[in-house]
């Protein structure tokens, strides 16, 4: 059973998250031949202040 975890800085719309789930699911089906019912995708919305880029929070970088 393929299980994908996606970490993203918060702020994506529900529609964007749906698209990520659909496309990652399809990629796993194509790559592994797993039935769709067995694919899992978990999106982690990470607050900007909890995401570091080159030693600075994404919030401080204006991301």
State what each model feature region is.
Residues 2-63:
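A domain-level signal for the structural core that forms small-molecule/cofactor-binding pockets
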């Amino acid at each position: 059973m393929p299980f994908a975890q996606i970490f993203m800085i918060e702020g994506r719309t529900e529609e964007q998250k749906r698209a990520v789930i659909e496309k990652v699911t399809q990629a796993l089906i194509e790559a592994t031949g797993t039935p769709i019912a067995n694919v899992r995708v978990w999106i982690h919305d990470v607050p900007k202040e909890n995401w570091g880029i080159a030693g600075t929070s994404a919030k401080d970088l204006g991301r």
